[in-house]
């Protein structure tokens, strides 16, 4: 078929002379962009021909055969009421078996109608395969715009769109597409119409039910109530999600560590811990984040001040919730209590972290060595041990640290600040841990107890060093002779033998001794008295055949002759 326009005293020109048509095989080789370009060009061509046709009136147009034409008195709304979809163009429903006479009329001349039919119920014109002359004929016959002809009289507005897409006559797009890929391509061509506007905020929706759901936000209505606690919700899905907190239902399971979640979004977010994915990247500094909330807060540091200030200490925050959480520090309130041991916390997140101690859960696993951690912060710090990353650098000396608090503590060396002062003797310290250890001198407290012999120590390092006596471990080995020691200090003294370093001289002799114990023993020869009076220094009493001498802070185990 070819629609032609006749101009006075001009030769007849058919639409085929200016149109470009494709076979089914050729059309299938075009991507979505190429198809869209084809439609755009054909619409422009049709528009020009229709404009030319206005001067000559429709009578000059070769009419569509009368047995295929749509009766004039039947409107589009009446077609829809009868269950006829708009993409049948001229009244022929597309979900019937085989092409209709109208479809055969639209097919390219000389082609087999059966060969042009794709995947059963899908017609050519619906997929966009209708020839340009067929579309143009529709424009001329029905006096509509190119867009209306292509998309099935969209000018009738959102009502028709709603009827078709909502399926008032049980008609759905999916029924026409046996292959999902064709549906996706089709939806990319169709304009996304959102005819339902919210009168409160102007937000548009494609379906009326979505508008009704949204409008509840403005009215404050919460029709869905939890029967367990009485809490109300504005959506049924929110109620369903909330009810899982009562019944303990956690249907979403992590395939990596087996951890369960009551929300799919929480599982997705958790899986980023295993994958290391950080999809949220700051455009300003390039820093990446695992969670959107952290990314949003970080962005505010580039663009905004901290509008929420604490009235007690003046510290600023980007969000009011963070200020409220911070203010609990000043009030001393701890509303979140552990049901296992009764310990209370001022943050819900701290309580959750604490509960992992009771459950033994360690969800954060190092991908390098397989070590697992209870807290995410500890996991991040451990990863830096593998990568060697030290992001916190001292501006004074350039020394870098992997932990921020180590940098703050180090900076006190440059400032000379010692903020931690002992109330008993007035001695000041740069670290809280130093003050705590010092106070044990006054209290006599020794919190670190050996589980083997019960001996107590005020420092963990002393306990660890002592425990090697029980285990027999000797990690410090001399590289010269292979002799091993359980402490570093005996190894250091031993190495002087190899280096011929003679650091100690006897009191009355020119002979030089290698070690402090040798010096003590040598002094006995001259004084013929106990080692204590010989060296004139405070040492523990010497037991028979064995003693433990504390010299210069080192605990030295030696067997001394008496």
Curated annotation (Swiss-Prot):
Domain KRAB: 13-99
InterPro entries: KRAB (IPR001909), KRAB_dom_sf (IPR036051), Zinc_finger (IPR050331), Znf_C2H2_sf (IPR036236), Znf_C2H2_type (IPR013087)
Domain of life of the native organism: Eukaryota
Keywords: DNA-binding, Isopeptide bond, Metal-binding, Nucleus, Repeat, Transcription, Transcription regulation, Ubl conjugation, Zinc, Zinc-finger
Compartments in which it is found: Nucleus
A single Gene Ontology CC term: nucleus
SUPFAM superfamilies, sorted: beta-beta-alpha zinc fingers, KRAB domain (Kruppel-associated box)
Start and end residues, zinc fingers (C2H2-type): 196-218, 224-246, 252-274, 280-302, 308-330, 336-358, 364-386, 392-414, 420-442, 448-470, 476-498
Record-level GO BP terms: regulation of DNA-templated transcription
Tissue expression per record: Ubiquitously expressed at low levels. Highest levels are found in pancreas and liver.
Per UniProt, location of the Glycyl lysine isopeptide (Lys-Gly) (interchain with G-Cter in SUMO2) cross-link in this chain: 117, 194, 203, 207, 209, 250, 278, 287, 300, 305-306, 362, 371, 446, 455
Molecular functions (GO terms): DNA-binding transcription factor activity, RNA polymerase II-specific; RNA polymerase II cis-regulatory region sequence-specific DNA binding; sequence-specific double-stranded DNA binding; zinc ion binding
Role this protein plays: May be involved in transcriptional regulation.
Family: Belongs to the krueppel C2H2-type zinc-finger protein family.
The name this protein goes by in its record: Zinc finger protein 460
